[in-house]
């Protein structure tokens, strides 16, 4: 959220964490110094966030990784070696619970600089989960990131975009945020599992009424040799499918076919 001081007291953090849990939300926070890491670790935070500007601070990342908690590393401004060094630092102390976020460190960021393909490339290159830290306006780039496999999305939230501060103008207000979440869930559901096993149960009626099956164009008497011009394909698709036509042509009718 916006407008909260980075010097928020330990008491405030505990209250905020408790409130999040009452809403079935996960309390997360970035940590930019050793003291903050230790405070958040004591709070038993679910994961620690490494901001983009701290990705080259390997001492800070090492201290985070040594907590054993999952780390979310934002990769704005980074090149491949920056990312590799950060990952190696975590793995060297036994922490492999990592998520890399593709990020463009502009506020706001124009969509054409979002480089969402990096979500897939980083996942394949480093063998870790990947997501997207979004600074664009609107929700369309976030939706696209899900289709590319983002499993974590960071989006700025504010109570009022007119508040003073660098992040408020491109952040989402609660109503917009809720709408984005509903659409994200739709996109997740729409991705499916990639299998193609024929019509789903919900499609059965369309399948039967829309597909065609083979029918006799004329009466075919018993004993007649079936020829191409005797057969047509018509709806509904409850009989012999058209792809079997070549197997039928040239056969002898074993009974009268109307």
Give the residues covered by each predicted segment.
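Short, surface-exposed connector motifs at secondary-structure boundaries
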Residues: 18-24, 41-47, 65-72, 122-129
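Alpha/beta enzyme core
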Residues: 34-46, 55-67, 85-99
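Catalytic alpha/beta core domains of metabolic enzymes, predominantly
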Residues: 80-194
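Alpha-helical segments flanking ligand/cofactor-binding loops in enzyme cores
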Residues: 14, 18, 38, 62, ...
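Conserved SET/PR domain catalytic loop and adjacent active-site segment
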Residues: 189-258
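Conserved, mostly hydrophobic/aromatic
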Residues: 40, 74, 100, 149, ...
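Single conserved hydrophobic/aromatic residue that forms the stacking wall/gate
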Residues: 1-8, 12
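Catalytic beta/alpha-barrel core
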Residues: 26-33, 46-57, 70-78, 101-102, ...
């Amino acid at each position: 959220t916006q407008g909260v001081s980075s010097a928020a007291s330990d008491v405030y953090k505990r209250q905020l964490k408790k409130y999040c849990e009452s809403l079935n939300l996960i309390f997360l926070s970035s940590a930019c110094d050793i003291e903050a890491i230790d405070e958040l670790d004591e709070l038993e935070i679910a994961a620690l966030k490494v901001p983009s500007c701290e990705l080259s601070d390997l001492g800070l990342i090492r201290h985070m990784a040594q907590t054993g908690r999952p780390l979310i590393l934002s990769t704005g401004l980074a090149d491949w070696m920056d990312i590799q060094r950060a990952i190696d630092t975590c793995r060297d102390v036994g922490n492999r619970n990592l998520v890399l976020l593709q990020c463009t460190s502009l506020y706001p960021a124009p969509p054409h600089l979002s480089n969402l393909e990096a979500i897939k490339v980083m996942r394949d290159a480093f063998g870790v989960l990947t997501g997207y830290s979004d600074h664009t306006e609107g929700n369309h780039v976030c939706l696209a990131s899900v289709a590319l496999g983002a499993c974590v999305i960071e989006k700025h939230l504010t109570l009022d975009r007119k508040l003073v501060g660098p992040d408020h103008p491109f952040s989402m207000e609660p109503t917009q945020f809720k709408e984005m979440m509903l659409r994200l869930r739709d996109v997740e559901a729409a991705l499916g599992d990639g299998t193609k096993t024929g019509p789903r149960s919900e499609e059965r009626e369309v399948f039967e009424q829309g597909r065609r099956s083979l029918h006799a164009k004329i009466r075919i008497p018993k004993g007649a040799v079936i020829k191409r011009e005797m057969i047509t394909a018509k709806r509904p698709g409850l009989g012999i499918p058209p792809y079997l036509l070549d197997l039928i042509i040239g056969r002898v009718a074993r009974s009268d076919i109307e």
